[in-house]
Every structure is written in structure tokens, then in C-alpha cells.
């Protein structure tokens, strides 16, 4: 039960009601005996600054940031981690004595999720999408892999070239060409969220490809379903959610929750 000592955490996004982060983090707080609660806050873009100011004034201990705020939130924070500053994306906010620090755990979450299916290092990775999550994933994976990012607005993808990442336009021709080259495909867009859409035509998928989708509702997106039918190894978006959540939790509390516990709680949330 909440009391005067209960710490408050949450996720801000638009929409945010679909988020599984509350059930996941609240399960971890209970398991570790931490007096805290985690809520979802639906914040439209025009109210983002007020929301962050309110969180600071109320002493909210930490936030996750999801679409469409991962880039815009930077303008309202006091400091950024090196990674967040480099890529211009934040998915985790830590309140340290009234100063709001921005961090990104998306890239690390994606890395740990992918490592469930393939050993990384020297891999050829194609990422679709150069939004907040896509940039963070590309930046992290480019440390030890060759990464190409395709985006409908090619300028956003090409802006990543200073990190040794290849950026190009997302169109059928480029998609087919780069998929012939790639060992790993990651959908870092929202295409497929609560819909039967896919960013990649099934005929472009080949058997030896590892396919990951950051979308986790539905758990088996059309992309993952068609990839499995083609014989591909797949990684669902819930694993990335779990691993980025574990790192956010560690930044807030200093504790590392159990991944099985967090995924189990998230799976229950999906089925409700």
C-alpha cells in the first residue's frame, strides 16, 4: 500500500495506455521489497514540457519515455548520458536530487534480446527506422557490427553516418538489396503495432535471416509470423522491453530485477 514514503515512477508517451511497463516494474518492486509504484502517463506532444516540469516539481523518482517523445524530451532535461547526447534520444529519466538526467537503455536492451538468437560481433545488421529507438539500437550495435539503417526520411538515417553507420532511403529497391546482404533484420518502427501490417514483404525474407521486431503488441507480429514461416530465427519485442526495463530499473534503484519475473508479468499483461 502506498504511503508518504512511496517513490513514484512512470512512463510517458502518446499513447501510453498500451504500455506493459507498469505491470513489469511493479512486479519487480514487489519482488525486491521496494516501496515504489509505477504508472502510465498519457502525454500529448504539446504538453510534454509541462509534464516534465510537473514530474520534477512533484519529485517523481524516474520515468521511461516512449513514442513520440524520445527526442523531444531532451530539451526539458538538465543533463544527458554520453550515449543519449550523441544520438539525441532518451528513454529513461533519473531524478537525482531535483536534477533530471536523460539516459538511453534501448540499445542495450536490443543487444541483449538479439544475443538470445545470435552471437553478435562482426554481423551485418539492417535496421528499419531512424526514430528514437532505431537510432539508439543502431548506435549500440555499430560498436562491434556493420549496421545499415533505412528510413522513409533518408536524412535521418544519413545523420547516423558519423558513427560509421550506413544510412539510406527506405524503399522496395533498397530493402531488397540490403536484405540480400544482411544477417540480421530489426524493425525499429511502430508498423505492426496492434495491426496486421508489416514493413517487409514476406517474399524478401530468407531462411538464414535473424528477424527481430521491437513491437510487442501483438507478441507475434505479422513480420515475425511470416519470418517464422520462412524458417527464420525470430526475437519478439517483449525481450527488448524486458532488457531495457532491467537497465532502467538499475539506473533508478541500483538493483537488477529478474528477467523471468519481468517477462512473466509482461506476458500476463498482454493476455489481459
UniProtKB/Swiss-Prot annotation:
It comes from Thermococcus kodakarensis (strain ATCC BAA-918 / JCM 12380 / KOD1). NADP(+) binds at residues 82, 129-133, 151-156, 214, 237. The gene is aroE. Pathway: Metabolic intermediate biosynthesis; chorismate biosynthesis; chorismate from D-erythrose 4-phosphate and phosphoenolpyruvate: step 4/7. It catalyses: shikimate + NADP(+) = 3-dehydroshikimate + NADPH + H(+). Its EC number is 1.1.1.25. The lineage of its organism: Archaea, Methanobacteriati, Methanobacteriota, Thermococci, Thermococcales. One of its GO terms (molecular function) is NADP binding. Homodimer. This is Shikimate dehydrogenase (NADP(+)).
Amino acid at each position: 500500500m502506498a504511503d508518504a514514503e512511496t517513490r513514484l515512477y512512470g512512463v510517458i508517451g502518446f499513447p501510453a495506455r498500451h504500455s506493459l511497463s507498469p505491470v513489469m516494474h511493479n512486479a519487480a518492486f514487489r519482488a525486491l521489497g521496494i516501496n515504489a509504484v509505477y504508472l502510465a502517463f498519457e502525454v500529448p506532444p504539446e504538453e510534454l514540457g509541462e509534464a516534465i516540469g510537473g514530474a520534477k516539481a512533484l519529485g517523481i523518482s524516474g520515468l521511461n519515455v516512449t513514442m513520440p517523445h524520445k527526442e523531444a524530451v531532451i530539451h526539458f532535461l538538465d543533463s544527458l548520458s554520453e550515449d543519449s547526447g550523441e544520438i539525441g534520444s532518451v528513454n529513461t529519466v533519473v531524478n537525482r536530487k531535483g536534477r533530471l538526467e536523460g539516459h538511453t537503455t534501448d540499445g542495450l536492451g536490443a543487444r541483449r534480446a538479439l544475443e538470445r538468437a545470435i552471437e553478435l560481433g562482426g554481423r551485418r545488421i539492417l535496421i528499419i527506422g531512424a526514430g528514437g529507438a532505431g537510432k539508439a539500437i543502431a548506435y549500440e550495435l555499430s560498436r562491434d557490427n556493420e549496421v545499415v539503417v533505412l528510413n522513409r526520411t533518408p536524412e535521418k538515417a544519413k545523420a547516423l553516418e558519423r558513427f560509421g553507420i550506413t544510412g539510406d532511403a527506405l524503399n522496395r529497391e533498397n530493402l531488397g538489396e540490403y536484405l540480400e546482404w544482411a544477417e540480421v533484420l530489426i524493425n525499429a518502427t511502430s508498423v505492426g503495432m496492434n495491426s496486421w501490417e508489416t514493413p517487409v514483404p514476406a517474399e524478401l525474407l530468407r531462411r538464414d535471416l535473424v528477424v527481430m521486431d521491437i513491437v510487442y503488441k501483438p507478441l507475434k507480429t505479422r513480420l515475425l509470423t511470416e519470418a517464422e514461416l520462412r524458417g527464420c530465427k525470430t526475437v519478439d519485442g517483449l525481450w527488448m522491453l524486458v532488457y531495457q526495463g532491467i537497465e532502467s530499473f538499475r539506473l533508478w534503484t541500483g538493483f537488477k530485477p529478474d528477467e523471468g519475473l519481468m517477462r512473466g508479468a509482461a506476458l500476463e499483461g498482454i493476455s489481459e
